[in-house]
């Protein structure tokens, strides 16, 4: 697993799973103890420090639920809610064609798309590099800026207000890397 994959896996997990999910305990422990920064491949120390200082799990969970859960959520985490004419089925078909195992949850969720990027990067054949470019250019970039802007605007906790720019910068850095790789 390389740095690109780690970024996508960490960010994808934080968006995909509710904060109280037992599978996130080790990740939140790393954040709370300031140890995530030691393994974080981007220069985002200030943002990571802000995350570390804002790990009140009750507040983080309540904010997550208000932001992302239910029909009345403040910021729908699904591509189909942001891109006119987009469907979850087209994302599911794209990922299925590449052999990615998918759960019954919506495939166009921001967390699923970031986890898919990690999975595709871990597969790492020439074809998967092209698949990663497609994932970013068609399924992530067209809406993630608006989505993250709304997360930042509607979040009531410093944690989620910080996750938005942290994610935005990471996605931008990963896209830059993909573009550089495709030019070689």
Curated annotation (Swiss-Prot):
Disruption effect? Answer: Mutants show no swarming ability.
Report the GO terms under cellular component.
cytoplasm; cytosol
Q: Mind telling me which InterPro entries this protein's record contains?
A: DmsD-type (IPR026269), DMSO/NO3_reduct_chaperone (IPR020945), TorD-like_sf (IPR036411), TorD/DmsD_chaperones (IPR050289)
**Chaperone listed as a keyword:** yes
Q: What SUPFAM superfamilies does the record tag this protein with?
A: TorD-like
Q: Where are the transmembrane segments?
A: none
The protein's UniProt keywords, in alphabetical order, are: Chaperone
- Cystine pairs annotated here are none
Q: In its UniProt record, which GO terms are filed under biological process?
A: bacterial-type flagellum-dependent swarming motility; DNA damage response; protein maturation
- Role played: Acts as a chaperone that increases YcdX activity, maybe by facilitating the correct insertion of the zinc ions into the catalytic site of YcdX. Involved in the swarming motility process.
**Other facts:** Does not bind zinc.
Q: Which family does the record assign?
A: Belongs to the TorD/DmsD family.
Instruction: Indicate the quaternary assembly.
Output: Interacts with YcdX.
> Would you tell me the protein name for this molecule?
Chaperone protein YcdY
């Amino acid at each position: 697993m390389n740095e690109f994959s780690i970024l996508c896996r960490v960010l994808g997990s934080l968006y995909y799973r509710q904060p109280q999910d037992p599978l996130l305990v080790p990740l939140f422990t790393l954040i709370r103890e300031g140890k995530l920064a030691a393994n974080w491949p981007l220069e985002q120390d200030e943002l990571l420090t802000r995350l570390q200082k804002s790990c009140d799990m009750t507040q983080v969970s309540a904010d997550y639920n208000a932001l992302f859960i239910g029909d009345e959520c403040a910021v729908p985490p699904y591509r189909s809610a942001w891109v006119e004419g987009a469907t979850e089925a087209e994302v599911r078909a794209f990922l299925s064609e590449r052999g990615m195992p998918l759960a019954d949850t919506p495939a166009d969720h921001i967390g699923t798309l970031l986890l898919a990027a990690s999975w595709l990067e871990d597969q790492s054949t020439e074809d998967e590099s092209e698949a990663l470019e497609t994932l970013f250019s068609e399924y992530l970039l067209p809406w993630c800026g608006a989505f993250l802007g709304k997360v930042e605007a509607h979040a009531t906790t410093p944690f989620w207000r910080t996750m938005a720019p942290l994610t935005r910068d990471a996605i931008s850095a990963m896209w830059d890397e993909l573009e550089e790789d495709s030019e070689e």
